[in-house]
Each structure stands twice: as structure tokens, then as C-alpha cells.
Amino acid sequence: MSRVYQERLASRSRLSDGCGSVPEPSPKLSIVVAAYCEKDNLQKLYEDLVEALTPLDVTWELILVDDGSTDEDTWNEIAALHCRDARVKGVRFSRNFGHQYGLFAGLSSARGQAVVTMDADLQHPPSAIPLLLREWDNGRKIVHTVRIDNGDTSWLKRTTSLAFYKLFSFLSGVDLSAGMSDFRLLDRRVVNELLQFREMGLFLRGLVHWVGYPSSKIEFQCQSRFAGTSKYNFRRMLRFAWTGITSFSTIPLRAGIIIGLLTSLVAFYQLGEALWLKCFTDRAVPGWASIIGLQSLLFGVLFILLGILGEYMARILEEVRGRPRFIVSETLGFPVDGSQPSPAGLASQYQGLN
């Protein structure tokens, strides 16, 4: 972005909407998209959204959250779209805080009576939004989407995803269907409820189910990524799954009691057998191999349980620290007079600059 363009954009951002127009009334629909190094997808995403929403004759806004992209091009693309269409608004994080926090920042600044969250890679098709709105018009406060695999997903990812959803539902009591994603519609009332949550470990898929309200599901055909590569590697997916489980269930902690009882029974059995052989028979007590093996098993179980306990203690430490969930370094298209919501001034848990 050239210096002249930056100065022109900065001067315009001092006005109400960032590009010189009068602040519009709250739209009926807000679309929230979290993007991390997605510069090649944003233009196509915007065009597809316009194509899908124009026939509906509905007022809308698009909130693009730059989740600390390592390139400048992503934010520059958001700025260009904003100056082309004032309905496009931008939120920029000071660093990468994570996809869930990006979506939450968008929810924090959305003004629509209905809010749709989706990904920037166009695997969530904008053409499905009219179906979401139809369900909302029929009284549904939450409209979930369930992904139909297009065949591009690897066997490993399908299997691990299915295993996670079944495990999560079993441990938490919150029923998540396999294939469920962050592509969903939320009524304003549901959004307001979500914004009251103060926990640091965000797992929106679980939280949306937890708040209740009438809901429905629609299926959509998962598209291939339009450009770029997925930023969600195996390590991130594993961390995401663990956050979801520990955010909604204490069963891993309680499982330690059961495992401890079972291993104690095994230990008592081994001890009783050794005493019986020593006192009532002429057979020699088995050698050190069995004893060391049993001790290794017990210590292994003990350290696993200590690790689980440590994870929960780390979660408690994060909550006690009271740090903001994310820091907003820059915004586009939001008022600076506080007359309407903006990511920079919603609550003390956020820190941002206009």
C-alpha cells in the first residue's frame, strides 16, 4: 500500500464509516469471516457474497477479521474492498490469536439481527446463505450446517474428525454431529448471549449448542479451497480438539479416579499373590521383571494423570491472569465516537485502537 493511499485512507477513517459515507442503520445480516494469510481468496469471497445476497434484497455487512496475517497483502486487500464497498469492514489483530478468537471478534462488532460466520477459503459456499436465512425466517435462532464430503478430505482426517465428535459428545453431553463446522447462522439474541462468556479457551461449536434455543441443520457440499493452502495442520487440529474437550468436560479428571482404582486392584492382586507364594508354598516369588513392569505401568498412568491435571491447572491460570483474549491494532469502517459497536471498545476483555 503506497504512502499516499495510506494517508487518504487514514483521513477517510476519521469520518463515520471510513470512506466518507454517512453511518448506515444496522443491517439485517452480518457476515463474519476470520482470515489468516487469505489475500487470494477475499476478492472472490466478496464477489460470491454479493452474487448470493443481491437477489434477496437484504441489508448486510461483511466483517473481515485479519488474524495477524504474516503478510501485508491480506490487510491491504481488506482495505481495498472497504474503500470499494462501505459495507465491508475490517478488524486487524496485533498478532495471530487463533481462528476462534477471530470469529469472536467479528461477533463482537457485528450489528446485524442475524450473523453468519464462515471461513475465507470458500469451502463454505456463500450460495448456502439464503438457505440459512430461510430457516431463520421460520423461527430458528441457530442454523447449523453439516458438511458433505466432496471426496478431497483424506481418510485420516475423516476418521479423526468422526472420532473427535463422538468422543466430545460422550464426554461433554453436548451433541455435536460429525461434519459440523463454524459455518452457521446465529440470531442476535444468541450472539448477545455468547458475548457474555468470559472464558479464555473458546470452542464456539460447543458454546453455540450450550446456549440452547431452537435450532436446525442444513447440509452443504464442501467446496475445494479456492486458493492457497490450509493453515490448520495436525498440531493445530489436535490443540483445537483438546481445547474443546477440556472446555466442556471434567470427565478426564474423574477418569483418573477410575484408572487409579483399577491399577490399585492390580497392585493389590500382585502383592497378595507374592505373599501367598512366600508363606504357603515352596515356589519362589517371581523375579524383578514383573515387579519393575508393574511399577512402570503404575508410574506411566500416574504421569498421564498428572499431565491431565496440569492441563486443567494451566486453563485456570489463563483465566486468573485476566489477559485480553485478543488485541485489535486497527479497524476499518467502524465509528470512532462509540455510537455503534466496534471491536475496540466493547468490553474490558478486549484492547484495541481505532
Residue ranges and their predicted role:
Residues 49, 106, 121, 143, ...:
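Residue-level signature of catalytic and energy-coupling elements of molecular machines
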Residues 2-154:
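Structured catalytic core of nucleotide-sugar glycosyltransferases
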Residues 95, 120-122, 188, 220, ...:
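Short, conserved catalytic or interaction motifs in soluble domains
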Residues 2-26, 150, 203-354:
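Hydrophobic helical membrane-anchoring modules
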Residues 80, 89-95, 99-109, 126-204, ...:
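Acceptor/aglycone-binding surface of glycosyltransferases and processive sugar-polymer synthases
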Residues 37, 72-73, 187, 260, ...:
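Residue-level detector of functionally special positions within alpha-helical transmembrane segments
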Residues 51, 55, 80, 84, ...:
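Conserved amphipathic alpha-helical interaction elements at protein-protein interfaces in regulatory
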Residues 37-40, 123, 127, 195, ...:
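Residues in soluble alpha-helical coiled-coils and helical-bundle/repeat scaffolds
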